[in-house]
From Swiss-Prot:
GO biological process: regulation of translational initiation
Protein name per UniProt: eIF5-mimic protein 2-A
Chain's role: Translation initiation regulator which may repress repeat-associated non-AUG (RAN) initiated translation probably by acting as a competitive inhibitor of eukaryotic translation initiation factor 5 (EIF5) function. Enhances histone H4 gene transcription but does not seem to bind DNA directly.
Organism taxonomic ancestry: Eukaryota, Metazoa, Chordata, Craniata, Vertebrata
Family matches, as SUPFAM superfamilies: ARM repeat
């Protein structure tokens, strides 16, 4: 038996090509860099020509693969090494964002270059946002002038919706915050952003990505107070941003207060202790009685699981509110607070459809408990109500209001007879 393996025939003169999809192209940005730098050197400071060059080059150069290189060159003139310094290679251009004039008009023109480029090549959007995040982390490696230009550009890009406000997360980097770089950068950024839009637009963008309550993080922990934030940005000419942050902190404090109140009620703490706690919080946070009664009402109504059946929920509400009427009474010492409470009740009964028929019974209960006065109820009925469910609630209150008016007239006539 021949144990030797039989040799298989071979094909000669045949070359097998690797399929294109199996080829692994080497990452080498140097040729790409040379092409971009050469083009920018030719276009110079003419940003219209720069935009046209970038538009045309996208058809010949691999923007998708070398997006970071492209953006590094447009911003800093060459490829950036970690930390924000330019790489040692000599392929760089003097025509970039960092060498441009430090004024808003020039930065607006640069923003247009980026805007046109990203609109033309939509796939660059994500890479551009990542580039901005990276540049913000490199701020310490840039000069003050370079930071100012980048801040102005970023503000304009945020205003135009080219990038998301989530990029601000990079500014909360501990080292940048500790050295005051983040706060100084934020001043320039928000000035250019508000210059393009307004504080309401800025606020909406911040809320969208959950940044509205994080602005205090631009400062180190020992300076992270509303007072410090307010003074810093007001002195820098950004009072509207200071007011916004103060308002956000106030909203945050109210939410925390409401949460704590609900927990105290769930734990079954005494009304005396709850009232003392609320009064202490009013002193600490300077919350007015009108604002506080709204918080108390919401907490009272959120501290219980309501029956889904309309016919049972009214009875449940009356029982619950009877228990907490002393708490409501403690924070309705003024007519304006009473009216605020009455409007809150109207809105609540309208927004929660099972309570639509309970409105009148709730008002009567609180009248009997000396929480709501007849003057305030009559004022609400004639002119003080809001539009929500107006016709339904006015109809419900009609007989009780007539009774109040008659009682008032009888009382007046008795006084006259007594005189």
């Amino acid at each position: 038996m021949n144990n030797q393996k039989q040799q298989k025939p071979t094909l000669t003169g045949q070359r097998f090509k690797t399929r294109k999809r199996d080829e692994k192209e080497r990452f080498d940005p140097s040729q790409f860099q040379e092409s971009i730098v050469q083009g920018l050197n030719q276009t110079g400071t003419d940003l219209e020509a720069v935009a046209k060059f970038l538009d045309a080059s996208g058809a010949k150069l691999d923007y998708r693969r070398y997006a970071e290189t492209l953006f590094d060159i447009l911003v800093a003139g060459g490829m950036l090494a970690p930390g924000g310094t330019l790489s040692d290679d000599l392929t760089r251009t003097e025509y970039c964002l960092f060498t441009a004039s430090e004024d808003l008009e020039t930065m607006q023109a640069y923003a247009q270059v980026f805007n046109k480029l990203i609109r033309r090549y939509k796939y660059l959007e994500k890479g551009f946002e990542e580039e901005i995040k990276k540049l913000l982390l490199f701020l310490k490696g840039f000069t003050e002038s370079e930071r100012n230009k980048l801040a102005m550009l970023t503000g304009i890009l945020l205003a135009n919706g080219n990038i998301s406000a989530s990029i601000l997360n990079s500014l909360f980097n501990e080292n940048l915050v500790k050295e005051g770089v983040s706060a100084a950068f934020a001043v320039k950024l928000f000035k250019s952003w508000i210059n393009e839009k307004d504080i309401n637009s800025v606020a909406a963008s911040l809320r969208k990505v959950g940044m509205d309550n994080r602005l205090m993080e631009l400062f180190p922990a020992n300076k992270r107070s509303c007072e410090h934030f307010s003074k810093y940005f007001t002195d820098a000419g950004l009072k509207e941003l200071s007011d916004f942050a103060r308002n956000q902190q106030s909203i945050g404090a109210r939410k925390e207060l409401q949460k704590e109140l609900q927990e105290q009620m769930s734990r079954g703490e005494t009304l005396k202790d709850i009232i003392a706690y609320v009064r202490e919080e009013m002193k600490k946070t300077s919350i007015s009685e009108q604002t506080m009664i709204g918080i108390v009402w919401t907490s009272v109504m959120s501290s219980v699981e309501w029956n889904k059946k309309e016919e049972l929920v009214t009875e449940q509400a009356i029982k619950h509110l009877k228990q907490y009427s002393p708490l409501l009474k403690a924070f309705t010492s003024q007519g304006l607070s009473e009216l605020t409470l009455l409007l809150k009740i109207q809105e609540y009964c309208y927004d929660n459809i099972h309570f639509m028929k309970a409105f009148q019974k709730i008002v009567v209960l609180l009248y009997k408990a000396d929480v709501l006065s007849e003057e305030v109820i009559l004022k609400w009925y004639t002119e003080g109500h809001v539009a929500k469910g107006k016709s339904v609630f006015l109809e419900q209150m009609k007989k009780f209001v007539e009774w109040l008016k008659n009682a008032e007239e009888e009382s007046e006539s008795e006084e006259e007879e007594g005189d």
